[in-house]
Regions:
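N-proximal low-complexity "stem/linker" segments adjacent to membrane-targeting elements
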Residues: 1-43
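Cell-envelope/extracellular polymer assembly enzymes that use nucleotide-activated donors
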Residues: 19-22, 51, 201
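Acidic helix N-cap motif at the loop->helix transition within catalytic regions
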Residues: 33-35, 61-70, 90
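A conserved acidic beta->alpha catalytic loop
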Residues: 56-65, 85
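Glycine-rich, basic loop-to-helix element that forms the pyrophosphate-binding segment
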Residues: 83-102, 124
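Conserved nucleotide-sugar donor-binding catalytic segment
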Residues: 100, 140, 156-238, 242-246
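Short aromatic/hydrophobic "clamp" motif used to bind/position activated sugar donors
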Residues: 107
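Conserved donor NDP-sugar-binding/catalytic core segment of glycosyltransferases
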Residues: 120-153
Length: 309
């Protein structure tokens, strides 16, 4: 458990009626990791008030008890949400409730098995967003970590740069645990309720509000890979299916919004992923079927997508 007292954490905070930033942390059966995660939050050195919302989805391994212990020690910082029954198994999403509970102008997100390493991370991100209203989200690098240590950066190359609004609208890849963004997402469109990769949907919706800033000056966070990880340990076909379903949800959403370019973009992604696991003959038959039902321009884009798959 962190050596910092609540008084030490709050000593430089500007008096305020509400926290400027809310840290959102969903947790489930992460007893071995949750303490390190919470300690990395409590290590943050800021001039502003922040709160920590930890949502435990009825863990069975003692995770909830650890969260409750931390909340008792830091009652003015940690707000635990401890469910007696598993909400996920009932088809209920954590996102709407957790986001609506957040009091902050800004949100930072980190799962209960990941953690941060830079004690000035939040201060740097909030300072940037306060000074740059045309940006809606900030992010930085994360290292892939397991019991043997770190194994390189999670997202490299083309992802280590700023993102324009269109890239965000198109669900640009961002390391979720590194993000700090404006609290402008209050309702989840009905089409996105069944999307397995909710963070991709968040980035797309945030694109309607501004740009993304990559901040390499922030020390990398830790993206933990382990057998209990909800996404990191999924098989390739499972990840493909999750991406396909997410893009299909986004296509339906933008179709209802009347945004034809984004609807077609996500439709192309769905088509390409769908074709990636089938035979050449099946691809040809699918293309012939689609050719009879879409515009020439869209068919050309679908064909290019098929050739890449």
């Amino acid at each position: 458990m962190s050596n910092r007292t609540e008084q030490q954490i709050r000593q430089h905070w500007t008096p305020a009626h509400a926290p400027l930033l809310s840290i959102l942390c969903p947790a489930y059966n992460q007893k071995a990791y949750i303490a390190q995660t919470l300690d990395s939050f409590l290590a943050q050195q800021t001039s502003f008030a922040f709160e920590i919302l930890v949502n435990d989805d009825a863990s069975t391994d003692g995770t909830a008890a650890i969260i409750a212990d931390y909340a008792q020690r830091y009652p003015n910082i940690i707000r635990p949400i401890l469910h007696a029954e598993n909400q996920y198994q009932q088809g209920k999403l954590f996102f709407p409730d957790l986001f609506n509970r957040a009091q902050g102008k800004y949100l930072a997100y980190c799962d209960g098995d990941d953690y941060w390493t830079d004690p000035l991370k939040l201060q740097k991100q909030v300072d940037f967003l306060e000074a740059n209203p045309d940006y809606v989200i900030t992010y930085h690098d994360a290292l892939i970590t397991d019991e043997k240590g770190s194994h390189g950066v999670q997202l490299t190359g083309e992802w280590q740069r700023d993102a324009n609004r269109m890239e965000l609208l198109r669900g640009r890849r961002i390391s979720t645990l590194t993000t700090c963004f404006r609290n402008v997402l209050h309702e989840l469109p009905r089409e996105l309720e069944q999307a397995p990769l909710l963070d991709v949907c968040w980035w797309s919706m945030l694109g309607a509000h501004g740009k993304g800033k990559y901040m390499p000056e922030i020390a990398p966070g830790a993206y933990r890979v382990h057998n209990g990880g909800l996404f990191s340990m999924r098989a390739g076909k499972q990840k493909l299916h999750m991406s396909l379903q997410t893009y299909a949800c986004l296509a339906n959403y933008y179709q209802r919004q009347g945004d034809q370019p984004l609807y077609e973009y996500y439709l192309v992604q769905v088509f390409g992923l769908s074709l990636s696991a089938i035979s050449p003959l099946q691809k040809l038959n699918a293309l012939l079927l689609v050719a009879r039902n879409v515009s020439a321009n869209l068919f050309k884009r679908l064909t290019l997508s098929a050739s890449r798959g």
